Amino acid sequence: MKLLLGDEIGQLKFIEIKKGTDTSNPESEAPVIQKFGELDREKGVLFMLKHEMNVFVARKNGTIECWNVNQEPPILSSLWQLDSSLLETASIVSMKYSNGWLMLALSDGNLLFRHIESSKLRKLQLHGPLSAVELHPRIPGIIAAGGKENDVCLYSCNPTCKSNIDELELWRTENVVKVFQGKNVKNDSLNLRVRVWITGIVFTEDIINVIDGKSEDDESLCFHFATITHYGQLRFYDTKHGRRPVSTFDVSTSPLSHVGLLPSIKLLYFADKRAQISIFDHSKKKVIGRFQGVKGAPSSIHCLGNVVAITGLDRNVRIFDADRKPLANAYIKALPTSIIVINERDAEIIKKEEELEAAKEEEEEIWRNMEQLEDTEDKKPSKRIKL
């Protein structure tokens, strides 16, 4: 398996690790680690995301880089440098990519967009503070945001929710409108107001078998998503059924920090700051299991196919399959802050498959040449014998 890891001292590490590796065992095979970049805490890695063969890296000092991981060694290019004045009173809370646009969200409500091909820049100002921002994974121009005492809102610059919209028309300030404003749950059993602090958002159409946007029978917009909170709640929303969540669950006594989907098994995961990473089944409305062995609060979780990679304060990279079976574990000296699974399969298996494929093609080529030779022999004119 191949991973890309960013750390607090500014380095990026390519890690090749085999299934079954466990560096806590002295007899285990060590992973192969390639390091890139100089040691500089001001350039500490905050976020990474992968699109096709490019990995975008957001650093603490506002530098945004693009890595082409298809090259050997990977090619690094500086993509964008944020104005330092933007980071004097705010911090980067999210980085997302959708339909040609890279988005950076700041805690004060500023959203900055850059079109990768044309280098066009656009800026939106949402109501802050923000601690969670998410773009819809399928529908262009849909964004969800929320924060401390700032309940979740949906904004759109694509009113028809069509997928073939001209991407250069996205994120124009004059076209962005609020399409949903979340409402707090009812007072608790003591008739006290429930505090609001959104710390994560994920759109859930992939795990509950629905389609967001507009349907042929109904012109009204409909979106399905989940939020996590600083106060340990997991909430599900269906915008057709009102502004309040359709269901809410107290799943932890510790602040929740991460939420995401496991599409291969139609489940959702969430993590708290006590190193509990849990799996939630929406159809059963309950937690059905946890990833075991994680010792420190997670700083980053990434899922690719059937593989889940987790890293955090215990300075370990832990890899599981989607059914929570441990696949590998490696200790990393510098505190990891972000992780991406580049390839979920072992390099040796890929090499063997490539060799088998090459041998198969060679054998087929030999048979094709033999058939052509036989056809040529059959077409040769036979000599007549004179009597």
Swiss-Prot record:
It is found in: Nucleus, Nucleolus. GO terms for cellular component: nucleolus; nucleus; preribosome; preribosome, large subunit precursor. Residues 368-387 are annotated as: Disordered. Involved in the biogenesis of the 60S ribosomal subunit. PANTHER family: NOP SEVEN ASSOCIATED PROTEIN 1, WD REPEAT-CONTAINING PROTEIN 74. Belongs to the NSA1 family. This is Ribosome biogenesis protein nsa1. It comes from Schizosaccharomyces pombe (strain 972 / ATCC 24843). The lineage of its organism: Eukaryota, Fungi, Dikarya, Ascomycota, Taphrinomycotina.
